[in-house]
From Swiss-Prot:
Catalytic EC class: hydrolase
Gene: NAG1
Signals that turn on the gene: By N-acetylglucosamine.
Protein name: Glucosamine-6-phosphate isomerase
Xref: NCBIfam families: nagB (TIGR00502)
Annotated PROSITE patterns: GLC_GALNAC_ISOMERASE
InterPro entries assigned to the protein according to its UniProt record, in alphabetical order: Glc/Gal-6P_isomerase (IPR006148), Glucosamine6P_isomerase (IPR004547), Glucosamine6P_isomerase_CS (IPR018321), NagB/RpiA_transferase-like (IPR037171)
Length: 248
Protein backbone atom coordinates (compact mmCIF):
# COMPACT_ATOMS: atom_id res chain seq x y z
CA UNK A 1 0.00 0.00 0.00
CA UNK A 2 1.02 3.56 -0.67
CA UNK A 3 0.01 6.20 1.85
CA UNK A 4 -0.31 9.96 1.96
CA UNK A 5 -1.13 11.86 5.17
CA UNK A 6 -2.35 15.45 5.31
CA UNK A 7 -2.90 17.80 8.22
CA UNK A 8 -6.56 18.41 7.40
CA UNK A 9 -9.44 16.94 5.35
CA UNK A 10 -9.35 19.74 2.77
CA UNK A 11 -5.75 19.05 1.79
CA UNK A 12 -6.43 15.32 1.63
CA UNK A 13 -9.44 15.89 -0.63
CA UNK A 14 -7.50 18.25 -2.89
CA UNK A 15 -4.66 15.75 -3.27
CA UNK A 16 -6.98 12.91 -4.20
CA UNK A 17 -9.09 15.05 -6.53
CA UNK A 18 -5.95 16.14 -8.39
CA UNK A 19 -4.81 12.52 -8.47
CA UNK A 20 -8.07 11.48 -10.13
CA UNK A 21 -7.90 14.40 -12.56
CA UNK A 22 -4.39 13.41 -13.63
CA UNK A 23 -5.51 9.82 -14.17
CA UNK A 24 -8.47 10.85 -16.31
CA UNK A 25 -6.46 13.34 -18.36
CA UNK A 26 -3.70 10.82 -19.06
CA UNK A 27 -6.10 8.13 -20.30
CA UNK A 28 -6.87 8.43 -24.04
CA UNK A 29 -9.82 6.02 -23.87
CA UNK A 30 -12.91 5.72 -21.69
CA UNK A 31 -11.94 6.01 -18.02
CA UNK A 32 -13.90 3.76 -15.66
CA UNK A 33 -14.24 5.16 -12.14
CA UNK A 34 -15.72 3.49 -9.07
CA UNK A 35 -17.36 5.85 -6.58
CA UNK A 36 -18.53 5.88 -2.95
CA UNK A 37 -21.01 7.98 -1.01
CA UNK A 38 -20.85 9.34 2.53
CA UNK A 39 -19.21 12.35 4.11
CA UNK A 40 -15.60 11.38 3.36
CA UNK A 41 -15.70 11.83 -0.45
CA UNK A 42 -17.79 15.01 -0.43
CA UNK A 43 -14.71 17.23 -0.42
CA UNK A 44 -13.28 15.31 -3.35
CA UNK A 45 -16.47 15.73 -5.34
CA UNK A 46 -16.51 19.47 -4.64
CA UNK A 47 -12.93 19.78 -5.92
CA UNK A 48 -13.73 17.75 -9.04
CA UNK A 49 -16.76 19.93 -9.77
CA UNK A 50 -14.61 23.03 -9.47
CA UNK A 51 -11.97 21.56 -11.77
CA UNK A 52 -14.62 20.63 -14.33
CA UNK A 53 -16.03 24.16 -14.33
CA UNK A 54 -12.51 25.53 -14.76
CA UNK A 55 -11.91 23.26 -17.74
CA UNK A 56 -9.14 21.30 -16.03
CA UNK A 57 -10.96 17.99 -16.50
CA UNK A 58 -13.90 16.65 -18.49
CA UNK A 59 -16.08 13.70 -17.56
CA UNK A 60 -17.52 13.23 -21.06
CA UNK A 61 -15.41 10.11 -21.50
CA UNK A 62 -15.77 8.80 -17.94
CA UNK A 63 -17.97 5.88 -16.91
CA UNK A 64 -18.88 5.50 -13.24
CA UNK A 65 -19.99 2.62 -11.02
CA UNK A 66 -21.19 3.36 -7.52
CA UNK A 67 -20.50 0.99 -4.67
CA UNK A 68 -23.93 0.59 -3.13
CA UNK A 69 -27.52 1.67 -2.61
CA UNK A 70 -30.08 1.25 0.14
CA UNK A 71 -32.69 -1.40 -0.55
CA UNK A 72 -36.21 0.00 -0.73
CA UNK A 73 -35.36 3.65 -1.38
CA UNK A 74 -36.43 5.29 -4.63
CA UNK A 75 -33.83 7.31 -6.56
CA UNK A 76 -35.83 10.44 -5.68
CA UNK A 77 -35.64 9.72 -1.94
CA UNK A 78 -33.47 12.36 -0.28
CA UNK A 79 -31.49 9.65 1.55
CA UNK A 80 -30.92 7.39 -1.44
CA UNK A 81 -27.44 7.18 -2.85
CA UNK A 82 -28.87 8.03 -6.27
CA UNK A 83 -30.01 11.36 -4.87
CA UNK A 84 -26.73 11.90 -3.03
CA UNK A 85 -24.60 11.32 -6.11
CA UNK A 86 -26.64 13.58 -8.37
CA UNK A 87 -26.95 16.29 -5.73
CA UNK A 88 -23.30 16.25 -4.70
CA UNK A 89 -21.64 15.43 -8.00
CA UNK A 90 -23.32 14.33 -11.22
CA UNK A 91 -25.67 17.31 -11.63
CA UNK A 92 -22.68 19.64 -11.62
CA UNK A 93 -20.33 17.99 -14.14
CA UNK A 94 -20.42 17.19 -17.85
CA UNK A 95 -20.80 13.41 -17.55
CA UNK A 96 -23.30 11.79 -19.96
CA UNK A 97 -26.18 10.32 -17.96
CA UNK A 98 -25.86 7.00 -19.78
CA UNK A 99 -22.35 6.66 -18.35
CA UNK A 100 -23.62 6.63 -14.75
CA UNK A 101 -24.30 3.28 -13.08
CA UNK A 102 -25.90 2.97 -9.64
CA UNK A 103 -27.61 -0.09 -8.20
CA UNK A 104 -31.42 0.11 -8.17
CA UNK A 105 -32.77 -0.19 -4.63
CA UNK A 106 -36.28 -0.77 -6.01
CA UNK A 107 -35.34 -3.56 -8.42
CA UNK A 108 -38.12 -6.13 -8.80
CA UNK A 109 -35.57 -8.91 -9.11
CA UNK A 110 -32.66 -8.28 -6.76
CA UNK A 111 -30.54 -11.22 -7.91
CA UNK A 112 -30.92 -10.15 -11.53
CA UNK A 113 -30.06 -6.54 -10.68
CA UNK A 114 -26.86 -7.62 -8.92
CA UNK A 115 -25.84 -10.06 -11.67
CA UNK A 116 -26.41 -7.42 -14.35
CA UNK A 117 -24.28 -4.93 -12.41
CA UNK A 118 -21.38 -7.39 -12.44
CA UNK A 119 -21.91 -7.92 -16.18
CA UNK A 120 -21.89 -4.18 -16.87
CA UNK A 121 -18.55 -3.84 -15.10
CA UNK A 122 -17.13 -6.73 -17.12
CA UNK A 123 -18.35 -5.11 -20.34
CA UNK A 124 -15.93 -2.25 -19.74
CA UNK A 125 -13.06 -4.65 -19.08
CA UNK A 126 -11.59 -3.09 -15.95
CA UNK A 127 -12.26 -0.33 -13.45
CA UNK A 128 -9.32 2.04 -13.82
CA UNK A 129 -9.67 3.52 -10.34
CA UNK A 130 -12.07 2.59 -7.56
CA UNK A 131 -12.45 5.37 -5.01
CA UNK A 132 -13.70 4.24 -1.62
CA UNK A 133 -13.95 5.03 2.06
CA UNK A 134 -13.90 3.04 5.28
CA UNK A 135 -16.65 2.39 7.78
CA UNK A 136 -15.74 3.00 11.45
CA UNK A 137 -15.34 -0.74 12.04
CA UNK A 138 -13.61 -1.52 8.78
CA UNK A 139 -16.42 -2.17 6.37
CA UNK A 140 -15.80 -1.48 2.69
CA UNK A 141 -18.86 -0.37 0.72
CA UNK A 142 -21.60 -2.29 2.58
CA UNK A 143 -19.40 -5.35 3.00
CA UNK A 144 -19.85 -5.86 6.72
CA UNK A 145 -17.91 -8.11 9.10
CA UNK A 146 -17.96 -11.70 7.87
CA UNK A 147 -17.93 -10.80 4.19
CA UNK A 148 -16.08 -13.26 2.00
CA UNK A 149 -13.07 -12.37 -0.14
CA UNK A 150 -14.97 -13.91 -3.05
CA UNK A 151 -18.17 -11.92 -2.52
CA UNK A 152 -19.84 -10.30 -5.52
CA UNK A 153 -22.59 -7.69 -5.84
CA UNK A 154 -25.47 -8.80 -3.63
CA UNK A 155 -28.10 -7.96 -1.02
CA UNK A 156 -26.56 -7.35 2.40
CA UNK A 157 -27.94 -6.85 5.89
CA UNK A 158 -26.56 -3.80 7.67
CA UNK A 159 -25.09 -4.35 11.13
CA UNK A 160 -26.01 -2.23 14.13
CA UNK A 161 -22.83 -0.13 14.03
CA UNK A 162 -23.48 0.86 10.41
CA UNK A 163 -27.08 1.75 11.18
CA UNK A 164 -25.93 3.87 14.12
CA UNK A 165 -23.27 5.60 11.99
CA UNK A 166 -25.76 6.38 9.21
CA UNK A 167 -28.72 7.44 11.34
CA UNK A 168 -27.40 11.02 11.35
CA UNK A 169 -28.64 11.20 7.75
CA UNK A 170 -32.10 10.06 8.87
CA UNK A 171 -32.78 12.64 11.56
CA UNK A 172 -30.84 10.57 14.10
CA UNK A 173 -33.68 8.05 14.04
CA UNK A 174 -32.26 4.53 13.71
CA UNK A 175 -35.70 3.13 12.88
CA UNK A 176 -35.69 5.09 9.62
CA UNK A 177 -32.38 3.66 8.39
CA UNK A 178 -32.92 0.83 5.87
CA UNK A 179 -31.84 -2.53 7.25
CA UNK A 180 -30.71 -3.88 3.89
CA UNK A 181 -28.71 -2.60 0.95
CA UNK A 182 -27.29 -3.67 -2.39
CA UNK A 183 -23.50 -3.58 -2.47
CA UNK A 184 -20.62 -4.53 -4.69
CA UNK A 185 -18.62 -7.36 -3.16
CA UNK A 186 -15.01 -7.60 -2.06
CA UNK A 187 -14.17 -9.54 -5.22
CA UNK A 188 -16.04 -6.98 -7.33
CA UNK A 189 -13.69 -4.29 -6.05
CA UNK A 190 -10.39 -6.14 -5.79
CA UNK A 191 -10.57 -8.35 -8.87
CA UNK A 192 -11.95 -5.76 -11.31
CA UNK A 193 -9.91 -2.69 -10.34
CA UNK A 194 -6.49 -1.71 -11.62
CA UNK A 195 -6.12 0.71 -8.73
CA UNK A 196 -7.97 1.46 -5.50
CA UNK A 197 -7.86 4.80 -3.68
CA UNK A 198 -9.26 5.07 -0.16
CA UNK A 199 -10.07 8.35 1.58
CA UNK A 200 -10.02 8.14 5.40
CA UNK A 201 -10.87 11.20 7.49
CA UNK A 202 -11.44 11.84 11.17
CA UNK A 203 -10.58 10.37 14.53
CA UNK A 204 -13.52 7.97 14.38
CA UNK A 205 -11.77 6.17 11.50
CA UNK A 206 -8.53 5.47 13.41
CA UNK A 207 -9.55 1.93 14.31
CA UNK A 208 -10.61 1.05 10.78
CA UNK A 209 -7.46 2.51 9.27
CA UNK A 210 -5.27 0.58 11.69
CA UNK A 211 -7.01 -2.69 10.84
CA UNK A 212 -6.74 -1.92 7.14
CA UNK A 213 -3.03 -1.19 7.16
CA UNK A 214 -1.60 -3.03 10.15
CA UNK A 215 -4.17 -5.70 10.91
CA UNK A 216 -4.27 -9.36 10.01
CA UNK A 217 -4.46 -9.69 6.21
CA UNK A 218 -7.74 -10.90 4.74
CA UNK A 219 -9.52 -10.88 8.10
CA UNK A 220 -13.29 -11.31 7.55
CA UNK A 221 -13.93 -9.46 10.82
CA UNK A 222 -12.55 -6.32 9.16
CA UNK A 223 -13.36 -6.41 5.44
CA UNK A 224 -11.09 -3.45 4.65
CA UNK A 225 -8.14 -5.72 5.54
CA UNK A 226 -8.79 -7.45 2.20
CA UNK A 227 -7.23 -4.38 0.60
CA UNK A 228 -3.87 -5.83 1.62
CA UNK A 229 -4.56 -8.46 -1.06
CA UNK A 230 -4.46 -5.86 -3.87
CA UNK A 231 -1.22 -4.79 -5.52
CA UNK A 232 -2.13 -1.15 -6.15
CA UNK A 233 -3.81 0.62 -3.24
CA UNK A 234 -3.42 4.29 -2.30
CA UNK A 235 -4.63 5.39 1.13
CA UNK A 236 -5.11 9.13 1.66
CA UNK A 237 -5.89 10.24 5.20
CA UNK A 238 -5.72 13.17 7.57
CA UNK A 239 -3.75 13.35 10.80
CA UNK A 240 -6.83 12.64 12.88
CA UNK A 241 -7.47 9.35 11.10
CA UNK A 242 -3.82 8.32 11.13
CA UNK A 243 -3.57 8.71 14.90
CA UNK A 244 -0.73 7.13 16.84
CA UNK A 245 -1.44 3.51 15.97
CA UNK A 246 -1.39 3.76 12.20
CA UNK A 247 2.15 3.24 10.99
CA UNK A 248 1.82 5.48 7.98
Amino acid sequence: MRQAIFSNPNDAAEYLANYIIAKINSTPRTFVLGLPTGSSPEGIYAKLIEANKQGRVSFKNVVTFNMDEYLGLAPSDLQSYHYFMYDKFFNHIDIPRENIHILNGLAANIDEECANYEKKIKQYGRIDLFLGGLGPEGHLAFNEAGSSRNSKTRKVELVESTIKANCRFFGNDESKVPKYALSVGISTILDNSDEIAIIVLGKNKQFALDKTVNGKPNDPKYPSSYLQDHANVLIVCDNAAAGLKSKL
